[in-house]
Amino acid sequence: MKTIGLVVKTDPEAARNADELEKWLAGRGVGVVRTGSVSDDRKAPVDLGCVFVLGGDGTFLSAARWIGDAPIPLVGIKFGGVGFLSETVEDDLFSAAEKILKGEFTIAKRMRLRVTIYENGQEQARRTVLNDVVINKGALARLAHIHTFVDGYDLTTYHGDGLIVSTPTGSTAYSLAAGGPVIHPAVPGIILTPICPFTLTNRPLVVPDSVRIELRLAQSPSDIMVTLDGQEGFEMTEGHRLMIEKAAHPVHMIILPGQRYFDVLKTKLKWGGGPAGY
């Protein structure tokens, strides 16, 4: 690898480690492109060999925005709170870097969603998300009424605080906190998780990743927002329509030797070991 990207959380410890990593890479003849802030109008150079993400899940999602559709592998180094998307921790940063430079890793492809927002029939925005699309109401707003179609079929109207549409990767984020299922990243599905539904029969639903989901507001109380990966938000009214489907380009995540998804899951969710009583 001739050049590596660095996306660094705004944190003194993460910044210090990033400085050390830059020097370490320079000593091995590897150039570095470093950023701490990400915007949609500034993308990563397409010739990066990979991107190290020093931070938490929010920083990782920012890095996924930074690379856009380019198949640049990402590796997360945990410096944040949760770290479901992190491959390793701060103490193993340089051993991970050594393995990556030697090519001792595999790639896991994580599905993304393409979100197109229409306002009065005109396209307002088009984005891709790795985790989720969230429609929710403000603290003082009335119930959100979200009319939901799957491949043109009138599925239901969700009445409640909102709705989360997530990828399997995003199933361990907001969707999990709202009562949604944990879905393995290799499962080709999309999860619809209502937030505090007023109708008790509105339960989380997993649909194939081949479907196209359309969301509209059946009624339009004020203060309804659409949030994309927790990074960007849009106001939503009755004049808006959301189209959500599987994106053409997945995110490529670096998997180091000996790392398994279930190890991360078990650690983060604090699951126990053997059967009760043993």
Swiss-Prot record:
<dbReference type="GO" id="GO:0019674">
    <property type="term" value="P:NAD metabolic process"/>
</dbReference>
<comment type="function">
    <text>Involved in the regulation of the intracellular balance of NAD and NADP, and is a key enzyme in the biosynthesis of NADP. Catalyzes specifically the phosphorylation on 2'-hydroxyl of the adenosine moiety of NAD to yield NADP.</text>
</comment>
<dbReference type="GO" id="GO:0046872">
    <property type="term" value="F:metal ion binding"/>
</dbReference>
<keyword id="KW-0808">Transferase</keyword>
<keyword id="KW-0963">Cytoplasm</keyword>
<dbReference type="Pfam" id="PF01513">
    <property type="entry name" value="NAD_kinase"/>
</dbReference>
<dbReference type="InterPro" id="IPR017438">
    <property type="entry name" value="ATP-NAD_kinase_N"/>
</dbReference>
<keyword id="KW-0547">Nucleotide-binding</keyword>
<dbReference type="InterPro" id="IPR017437">
    <property type="entry name" value="ATP-NAD_kinase_PpnK-typ_C"/>
</dbReference>
<dbReference type="GO" id="GO:0006741">
    <property type="term" value="P:NADP biosynthetic process"/>
</dbReference>
<dbReference type="InterPro" id="IPR002504">
    <property type="entry name" value="NADK"/>
</dbReference>
<comment type="similarity">
    <text>Belongs to the NAD kinase family.</text>
</comment>
<feature type="binding site">
    <location>
        <begin position="57"/>
        <end position="58"/>
    </location>
    <ligand>
        <name>NAD(+)</name>
    </ligand>
</feature>
<dbReference type="GO" id="GO:0003951">
    <property type="term" value="F:NAD+ kinase activity"/>
</dbReference>
<keyword id="KW-0520">NAD</keyword>
<dbReference type="Pfam" id="PF20143">
    <property type="entry name" value="NAD_kinase_C"/>
</dbReference>
<keyword id="KW-0521">NADP</keyword>
<feature type="binding site">
    <location>
        <position position="231"/>
    </location>
    <ligand>
        <name>NAD(+)</name>
    </ligand>
</feature>
<protein>
    <recommendedName>
        <fullName>NAD kinase</fullName>
        <ecNumber>2.7.1.23</ecNumber>
    </recommendedName>
</protein>
<feature type="binding site">
    <location>
        <position position="159"/>
    </location>
    <ligand>
        <name>NAD(+)</name>
    </ligand>
</feature>
<keyword id="KW-0418">Kinase</keyword>
<dbReference type="GO" id="GO:0005524">
    <property type="term" value="F:ATP binding"/>
</dbReference>
<dbReference type="GO" id="GO:0005737">
    <property type="term" value="C:cytoplasm"/>
</dbReference>
<feature type="binding site">
    <location>
        <position position="142"/>
    </location>
    <ligand>
        <name>NAD(+)</name>
    </ligand>
</feature>
<feature type="binding site">
    <location>
        <begin position="131"/>
        <end position="132"/>
    </location>
    <ligand>
        <name>NAD(+)</name>
    </ligand>
</feature>
<dbReference type="GO" id="GO:0051287">
    <property type="term" value="F:NAD binding"/>
</dbReference>
<feature type="active site" description="Proton acceptor">
    <location>
        <position position="57"/>
    </location>
</feature>
<feature type="binding site">
    <location>
        <position position="161"/>
    </location>
    <ligand>
        <name>NAD(+)</name>
    </ligand>
</feature>
<keyword id="KW-0067">ATP-binding</keyword>
<dbReference type="InterPro" id="IPR016064">
    <property type="entry name" value="NAD/diacylglycerol_kinase_sf"/>
</dbReference>
